């Protein structure tokens, strides 16, 4: 749910994703927990996470068939019915959305080949949503969105979680976070409260939690409370709960790339949030004067190999 660019501790620059509890969320979600450890498939959680691609066509096709059988058995569709999927776009004037739409349609169409859904998927688009994409999804006017969503709060993942758990912000109207219960282990004790109550707790509100033995106590872990480690653990548990709803499905990713010249050195080769790697021109240093650079290029036969 959260990328490496979400910072859990602005004072230290530590990203949310770098913490062990956040790593475990991913390992658990992708079903790799039993495969991590000495002598197992993955030595560390980092190794396991590195292996995650989210792509397993054979398993996906099994699930397509299972979903089809369930839908027919429950009377949600009849054999031979078409499944209509409307993808919402803010507009159709940019390549990102038009090409993205084509990409998703092709991927799903090809993925169901050989399954009971082959030839039964029909895609349409609504490219008139503009900034109203969230309301359109909540009102079931569209079935899928991509390339849109919440931004901001990169330095406050605790506040950002409200976008996925609150009635005012979340896209999924079917998930009642005030009644969905979530158990979080804190200091060796398992405590249970609703998803929404846990969210309130990390925002500084006092809530009542129930321990495994049935006893109740109060809990709060806001910005000013002296239990930031527990606050982080609750946030991780909330991320896991959101992922388990399977409403946020990783479908696409985008990135940018730049070629670093042999003529310069960056201030650091490590990414720094808000700065990047080179931190603007004032942090660049040059390895050659213009004359030295000309000589260097000539010494390489006039062509530099950046492979």
Predicted regions and their residues:
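Ligand/substrate-recognition segments at binding pockets and active sites
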Residues: 29-30, 34-152, 228-231, 256
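Generic hydrophobic alpha-helical scaffold/packing signal
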Residues: 61, 105, 134, 138, ...
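Short, solvent-exposed loop/beta-turn-alpha elements that line the ligand-binding surface or hinge
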Residues: 7-58, 73-82, 136, 162-218, ...
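Hydrophobic/aromatic-lined pockets within catalytic cores
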Residues: 6, 10-11, 15, 109, ...
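Bilobed periplasmic-binding protein-like "clamshell/Venus-flytrap" ligand-binding domains
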Residues: 1, 63-92, 202, 206-261
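Aromatic-acidic/polar surface patches that form glycan- and anion
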Residues: 53, 97, 191, 224, ...
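Short, well-ordered loop/turn and helix-capping segments at boundaries between secondary-structure elements
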Residues: 139, 151, 166-170, 204, ...
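Short, solvent-exposed loop/turn and secondary-structure capping segments
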Residues: 1-4, 61, 98-104, 155-160, ...
């Amino acid at each position: 749910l959260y990328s490496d660019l979400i910072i859990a501790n602005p004072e230290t620059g530590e990203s949310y994703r770098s913490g062990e509890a956040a790593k475990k969320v991913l390992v658990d979600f992708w079903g790799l927990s039993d495969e991590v450890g000495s002598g197992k498939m993955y030595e560390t959680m980092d190794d396991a996470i590195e292996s995650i691609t989210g792509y397993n066509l054979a398993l996906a096709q099994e699930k397509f068939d299972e979903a089809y059988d369930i839908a027919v058995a429950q009377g949600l569709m009849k054999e031979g019915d078409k499944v209509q999927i409307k993808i919402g776009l803010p507009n159709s004037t940019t390549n990102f959305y038009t090409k993205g739409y084509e990409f998703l349609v092709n991927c799903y169409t090809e993925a169901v080949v050989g399954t009971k859904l082959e030839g039964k998927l029909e895609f349409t688009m609504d490219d008139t949503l503009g900034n109203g994409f969230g309301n359109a999804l909540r009102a079931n006017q569209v079935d899928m969105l991509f390339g849109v969503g919440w931004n901001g709060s990169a330095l406050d993942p605790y506040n950002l979680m409200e976008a996925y758990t609150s009635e005012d912000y979340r896209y999924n109207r079917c998930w009642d976070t005030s009644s969905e219960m979530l158990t979080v282990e804190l200091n060796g004790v398992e405590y249970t409260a609703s998803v929404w109550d846990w969210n309130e707790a990390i925002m500084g509100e006092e809530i009542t939690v129930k321990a495994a033995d049935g006893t109740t106590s109060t809990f709060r872990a806001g910005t000013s409370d002296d239990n930031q480690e527990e606050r982080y653990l609750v946030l991780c548990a909330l991320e896991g709960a959101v992922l388990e709803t399977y409403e946020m499905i990783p479908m696409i990713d985008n990135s940018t790339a730049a070629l670093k010249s042999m003529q310069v050195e960056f201030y650091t080769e490590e990414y720094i949030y808000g700065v990047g790697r080179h931190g603007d021109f004032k942090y660049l240093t040059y390895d050659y004067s213009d004359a030295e650079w000309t000589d260097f290029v000539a010494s390489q036969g006039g062509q530099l190999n950046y492979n």
